[in-house]
């Protein structure tokens, strides 16, 4: 959220062997080459012969397009890597480059994305070549034979992503990648796989181009609204009118961001220029894949030059499954609520995060700095570290955690740090109970408990306050047992819908002292001054003042005329970009990039009435003025972007989303629970005594156990927000009793 729920990955410039689906990059390359050689060994028609009729394509043309695609993609990746290394070393990196450094696919994600890039660029090249031969309109994938599509899949490497997946007969713990959670379909919920689609994609050309790509092309008979214009006319409001939420703390917003970073991450392209033409998406407003810039409407309140644009990069494509034709996006993380933001979603990273120097099962901690005697996250060992550039004199690098966005803002870093400390506290206590356990057993048992804690806090404390009691009963009835026919993958639409959290963001980071008074210096730092500022955690008092601020400050209330603050609508990444970004507008552009259907399609999916007229929309929204504004922009409710429509609805009683988002969020979390073999309440995961002990845990108690804070929120930490009324001493909160983890010697 703040940039909460906003994608950002750091680029690792030196890529060693990568794992994806259990195969090293080298193994996958060999398999791909083997597939290509097998194809080349079969007799092929002569090079360059023009097809006699529409529908006949020489396989030689398919192969030459793939080879050309590989050269273009590899060149773009290499140039990008070398350019940013050189600029970071010389200190001349532009703010835009600094930000983009955080958003790259790394390790196994990079391997999976590169294969998909090969495939999509080859199809693009093939279409260009065939267009010069044929005058009639066509979709390139419709004119290729199944055998030729198979050639493309194999020679790109896509066909080999799930080769050789075998699951052990017995498994006590989750895999790091999420692989084998579902024994019948081992890749379901695993990292570096495509999102699931609950409704078919809607692209302008039917398979890849987003609506708004081609000037003049209408959607459902109406012009496509400019995302920035919608943001200006409907989302924008004066910050001094902001309404604080009397029944939600800022921690409610913060848990949403942390949780989102457990569930999904969609990387942006490693190459920041057009593969085919080399146009730079960062500096140019030319629209060529992967650049899909946001156009500026007339009379924009901030950007006066209408020829300018807000930069936007299309999300990385995923290797297609059975349907090679329709573009989908990749989830770099495990879908499951498994604390992957603490432990990682790939094996090499997971090993990197551990302290392997002893048999204590600990996570590695910072060797240079402490926070009042307590551990901080270790620093990442990037050759060129962008966090150093946010405060050149401080020389504080980025942190390393299970999700690469941990340094995005200090509030998020504080939550990562809290869970790191809790893991190490648990591992240490388990060691004293079971002196014979080795480091691996201690690590896995502590990891299992932390994963259960994240599940409990999310489903018991957080989700009821998102959905409200009625939707909670409807979408998340009492847990029965694991069901291996439930698909636990994150839905593409959820990645956009869960950005509802942007409506909760306050424009400041708040820091409070041990009396819950504003902490000097800098008690209220504008959000635009904290992005990527790892130095603020190390040098400005650690995580305690930040956690107090999250507990004792109200979240922003989403109202229909106060949707999102200008700090994220006008000044997002202002310090680190050539132009401040507009997060609500980016959400809308992203839904089009991902081919997500519009508002009414999702209302239909959820069994909700679909308004057709202004009056009907006014009835649904209980706000005719807002309905008129939306219809002015979109022409029809069918075209309203899912995020815009979702956050415009009146909130459900005691919830913080309307009926549509309650359906999408509730449905997703039901699948994540019922389709998880390692769900904490599933029979055989924990003993009955262990489950009873875990039911006592709370986020305030975790804060008590791992910080210098002695007074914390009582009742629900996400609801209480007024000090001292809603606060209690730590001694009144039950601690987790680990007695049932003691093994008989």
From Swiss-Prot:
GO MF entry, a single one: chromatin binding
Xref: SUPFAM superfamilies: Heme-dependent peroxidases
Active site: 261 (proton acceptor)
Site (Transition state stabilizer): 405
InterPro entries referenced in this protein's UniProt entry, alphabetically: Haem_peroxidase_animal, Haem_peroxidase_sf, Haem_peroxidase_sf_animal
Family: Belongs to the peroxidase family. XPO subfamily.
Name this polypeptide is given: Myeloperoxidase
Organism listed in the record: Homo sapiens
């Amino acid at each position: 959220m703040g940039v909460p729920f906003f994608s950002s990955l750091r680029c690792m410039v030196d890529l060693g062997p990568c794992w994806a689906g259990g195969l090293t990059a080298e193994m996958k390359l060999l398999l791909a080459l083997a597939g290509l050689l097998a194809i080349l060994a079969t007799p092929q028609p002569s090079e360059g012969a023009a097809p006699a009729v529409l529908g006949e394509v020489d396989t030689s043309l398919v192969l030459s397009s793939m080879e050309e695609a590989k050269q273009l993609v590899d060149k773009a990746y290499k140039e990008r890597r070398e350019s940013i290394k050189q600029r970071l070393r010389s200190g001349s990196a532009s703010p835009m480059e600094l930000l983009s450094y955080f958003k790259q696919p790394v390790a196994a994600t990079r391997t999976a994305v590169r294969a998909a890039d090969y495939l999509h660029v080859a199809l693009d090249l093939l279409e260009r070549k065939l267009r010069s031969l044929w005058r009639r309109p066509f979709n390139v994938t419709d004119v290729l034979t199944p055998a030729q599509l198979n050639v493309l899949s194999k020679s790109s490497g896509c066909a080999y992503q799930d080769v050789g997946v075998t699951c052990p007969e017995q498994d006590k713990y989750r895999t790091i990648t999420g692989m084998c959670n579902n024994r019948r379909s081992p890749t379901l919920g695993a990292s570096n796989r495509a999102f699931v689609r609950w409704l078919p994609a809607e692209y302008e050309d039917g398979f890849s181009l987003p609506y708004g790509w081609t000037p003049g092309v209408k959607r459902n008979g109406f012009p496509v609204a400019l995302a920035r214009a919608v943001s200006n006319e409907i989302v924008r409001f004066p910050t001094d009118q902001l309404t604080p939420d009397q029944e939600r703390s800022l921690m409610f917003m913060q848990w949403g961001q942390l949780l989102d970073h457990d569930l999904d991450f969609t990387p942006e392209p490693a190459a920041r220029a057009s593969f085919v033409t080399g146009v730079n998406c960062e500096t140019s407003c030319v629209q060529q894949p992967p650049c899909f810039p946001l156009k500026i409407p007339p009379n924009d309140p901030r950007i006066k030059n209408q020829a300018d644009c807000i930069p936007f990069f299309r999300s990385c494509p995923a290797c297609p499954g059975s349907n090679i034709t329709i573009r989908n996006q990749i989830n770099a993380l495990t879908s499951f609520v498994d604390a992957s933001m603490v432990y990682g979603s790939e094996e090499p990273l997971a090993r990197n995060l551990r302290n392997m120097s002893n048999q204590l099962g600990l996570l590695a901690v910072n060797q240079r700095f402490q926070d009042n005697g307590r551990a901080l996250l270790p620093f990442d060992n990037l050759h060129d570290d962008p966090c150093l550039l946010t405060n050149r004199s401080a020389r504080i690098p980025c942190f390393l955690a299970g999700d690469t966005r941990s340094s995005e803002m200090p509030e998020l870093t504080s939550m990562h740090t809290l869970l790191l400390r809790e893991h190490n506290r648990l591992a240490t206590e388990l060691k004293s109970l079971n002196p014979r356990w080795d480091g691996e057993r201690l690590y896995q048992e502590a990891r299992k408990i932390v994963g259960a804690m994240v599940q409990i806090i999310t489903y018991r404390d957080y989700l009821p306050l998102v959905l409200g009691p009625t939707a909670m009963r409807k979408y998340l009835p009492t847990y029965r047992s694991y069901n291996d026919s439930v698909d636990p993958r994150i839905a593409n639409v959820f990645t956009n819908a869960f950005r509802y959290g942007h409506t909760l963001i306050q424009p400041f980071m708040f820091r409070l002292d041990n009396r819950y008074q504003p902490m000097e210096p800098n008690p209220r730092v504008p959000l635009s001054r904290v992005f990527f500022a790892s130095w603020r955690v190390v040098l400005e008092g650690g995580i305690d003042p930040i956690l107090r601020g999250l507990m004792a400050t109200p979240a922003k209330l989403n109202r229909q005329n106060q949707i999102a603050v200008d700090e994220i609508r006008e000044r997002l990444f202002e310090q680190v970009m050539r132009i401040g970004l507009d997060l609500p507008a980016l959400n809308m552009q992203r839904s089009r990039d991902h081919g997500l259907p519009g508002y009414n399609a999702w209302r239909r999916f959820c069994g909700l009435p679909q308004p057709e007229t202004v009056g009907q929309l006014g009835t649904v929204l209980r706000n005719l003025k807002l309905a008129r504004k939306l219809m002015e922009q979109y022409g029809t409710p069918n075209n309203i972007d899912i995020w815009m429509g979702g956050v415009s609805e009146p909130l459900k009683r005691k919830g913080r989303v309307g009926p549509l988002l309650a359906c999408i969020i509730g449905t997703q979390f039901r699948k994540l629970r019922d389709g998880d073999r390692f769900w904490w309440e599933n029979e055989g995961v924990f003993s009955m005594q262990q489950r009873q002990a875990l039911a006592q845990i709370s986020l305030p108690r975790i804060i008590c156990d791992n910080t210098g804070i002695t007074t914390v929120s009582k009742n629900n930490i996400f609801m209480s927000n007024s000090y001292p009324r809603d606060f209690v001493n730590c001694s009144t909160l039950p601690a987790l009793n680990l007695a049932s983890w003691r093994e008989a010697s």
